[in-house]
Amino acid sequence: MNQTPLNTEKFQRKAVKVEEAQSRIASYAQQGEREDVGLEQAHGRYLAMDLTAPHPYPRFRRSGMDGYAILASDTEVCSTGQEIWLHVIDEIPCGTVSDKRVETGMAVRIMTGAQLPEGADTVVMLEATQLREENGQTYVGLKKRMEVGKNVTQIGHEIKEGQLLLSKGTCVGAGHVSVLATFGVHRVPVYKKPRVAVFSTGSELLAVDEPLQPGKIRNSNTYMLASQIREAGGEPFILQAIHDDLNLARASVREAIAAYDIVVTSGGVSVGDFDIMGDLVRQKDVNMLFNKVTMRPGSVTTAAVIDGKLLFALSGNPGACFVGCELFVRPTIQMMLSSAHPYLQTWTAKLGADYTKVNNYTRFVRSSLEIRSGQVYAIPARVDESSAMVTIKDSDCLIVVPPTTEGLHEGEEVHVLVLQGGQVM
């Protein structure tokens, strides 16, 4: 009886290190296009150009407190304990400008933030003065010697004209919005959000609103990935899950590549008979970047280029899928947005509990963070198998465990990759 020869190509995978995999991806990450959005829509977006100050800030000398604008030279005699009286010639509420000039023997009542009148060079606080009325005129008395510029914010104290305000690639937050508004930037140049197609493969998958059936599971990875993509600054588009059919997968991927900037799939990347994505990336018209990484979980994580666009084929195991997205998809989106720091931040922490697993590959262990006596500790998840789903929600970071034959002990110093939204409790 003749038998079809076993195709062993899918078993012959050359593993690359995480850093090498990231480097290969980075060479294909294309910078996004620019669009202008209203200031109220700019939060969370990434600036597409450097922004410089069109004017100094503040633009005028302003009072730092409620008091009186005076000439510091008038107070020189106060060093001997002598009290002086100055004629109050005007009052300046915030938002108005006086047309009076302060000269020797004069003072102007001024409010916090108001523009100093011409001639004045210092402000004495209200609490250090007293008033008297004489022949219908108001006089202010003080006994304290004042220095030039006291309680006065000078022109350009915070920002000089032409100074860099915000750098290209900055993720706009509340403080940045305040700066933009202050300088009248009502239309903000940002990068368009990368459009990312997401779908899962597997005949065992059910829609989230379908009742459970024997041997079936709900399609949770797609929604998890969509959230991760959104957090990274992308715009996810959830496509319909497909069955384990290579031709169907090829057509779905081609259609997605044509319509979106990035394509991310979950499932079908191992070496089984129904692992269709593993077969798809070996097609002649696909530029496979790698199909094995020296990491756990997610060693079968795969990346390829089709028609100049990146395809990420992630593991169907939730833990491995999550880690693969954080290490490879997130940085790609961030690079398309010109983020200065596309990769997860690395911290040093103490290991909060023994970790006994031995590893021939670098392991990224889901963990929580907490403070003990002023020291940051990373506590490994109790269940961290690649198939485990529930512990993802409790993860603040990924402990980076290098290849080891002995495991790690509580109290050892470890490196951790801090996840977006990770909190130290």
Give, region by region, the residue ranges found by the protein language model:
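Flexible glycine/proline-rich
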Residues: 35-40, 44, 49, 95, ...
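Conserved active-site and cofactor/substrate-binding residues in soluble primary-metabolism enzymes
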Residues: 13-20, 34-37, 41, 65, ...
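Short, glycine/charged-enriched hinge/interface segments at domain edges or termini
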Residues: 2-18, 69-240, 378, 382-383, ...
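Structural signal for hydrophobic packing residues in well-ordered secondary-structure cores
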Residues: 26-33, 50, 72, 116, ...
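Thr-Gly-centered strand-to-loop micro-motif
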Residues: 110-112, 126, 167-168, 208, ...
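Short, low-complexity N-terminal leaders and the immediately following helix N-cap/first helix
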Residues: 1-80, 109, 339-364
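Helix-rich terminal scaffold detector
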Residues: 1-5, 11-18, 186-314, 318-324
